[in-house]
Amino acid sequence: MSGSSPARPSVVVIGGGYAGVNVAKSLDDVADVVLVEPKDAFVHNVAALRALVDPGWLPRIYLPYGGLLSHGRVVQDRAAKVDAGRVVLASGEELPADYLVLATGSSYPFPAKSDVDRTVDAHEKTLGTHAALAAAGRVLLVGAGAVGIELAGEIKAVWPSKQVTLVDVADDVLGGPFRPELKAELRRQLAELGVPVLLGSPLVTAPPTEPGELRTFTVQTQAGTEVTADIWFRCYGVIPVSDYLAGGLAGARGADGHIEVTPTLQVAGQDRVFALGDVSTADRKVAGAAGRQAVVVAGNIRALIEAGSGAAGDAGAAGEAGPAAGAAGLSEYQPAPPGIVVPIGPEGGSGQRAGSEDLLPPEMVAQLK
């Protein structure tokens, strides 16, 4: 019809975490965006451990999706089967897509990440676990990476007299490409708080209770050290969420569950399917990297739209042939040098700034976190 507006391309973003939300918001003005997310609110996971010891933080970390998109919509559902150009939800609804963005992230044991979909249930679980933790005199944290170290600091900041023990099979704290000086500083601060760190020897058997359950038990490391605790938490175990991939996309899923991407963050072998954040092979699994990747993905989809690829009815569905990356002027994601911020309570911790030799002092960690 004369004078009618051209159809806008459809973009389906699967996953409403840091990466997915940023991509969806950035493309809301140029596409019909559908954000698919099983949770009823955005979860600010960075503050989840603080909320466990201080439930007053709960309203700050669960942020409803209402008002996120001006033109698009948020669908509270789970992706059950995703192929290029088509998303089948757990409810049975099917969503066509000119562009697909896979931003489903990863799962991680509670309390670092919520494992329930409704905010009311998440609040109830956190409050119950807080009460159990408050009543415990001795706490075992299995895993001495960033989560275990941070949780130890949060617990000691609120309950200084609690006995908190960290145990890890690794020979040092904070696995990954980080400077020995940073690891030494974190060990020093933990020792200053009276937190024993048992390294280089796994537990003979897992604790006989569920994580977060208040019940006294004793476990032993293979080195022979016994640890008695009243409650424990699992502080390891990142698992990419990608089991929904089907058809031509299934081949992009690696043995470890990560989705293989090109430097432009397109899924290998696909022109209009992108993956980013924890679920992709693009970079380290931190919120900052997800945000930087979102800028690249949103910019590249916008470039493809402006180049004429993918408007509804023009070039078919996601995954079909479109202009080459060079022809559309797509940007490549450049991973940053290793960097991390590890708080130990509200006033402690340290970090490694990307590309810098200097360690972050505790006061800067407090500001950044």
Predicted regions, residues:
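FAD-binding core/adjacent interface of flavoenzyme oxidoreductases
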Residues: 2-10, 70-140, 233
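Catalytic nucleophile loop
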Residues: 17-20, 145-149, 294, 298
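Beta1-alpha1 glycine-rich phosphate/pyrophosphate-binding loop at the start
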Residues: 2-73, 150-178, 353
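FAD-site-proximal beta/loop scaffold in flavoenzymes
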Residues: 118-137, 226-299, 303, 319
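C-terminal, flexible cofactor-proximal segment of oxidoreductases
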Residues: 284, 293-369
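Short glycine-rich anion-binding loops that position phosphate/pyrophosphate groups of nucleotides
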Residues: 19, 105-108, 238-240, 347
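A Rossmann-like FAD-binding core segment of flavoenzymes
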Residues: 72-77, 81-82, 87-88, 95, ...
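Short glycine-enriched, charge-decorated loop/helix-capping segments at active-site entrances
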Residues: 48-54, 114-121, 249-250, 357-358
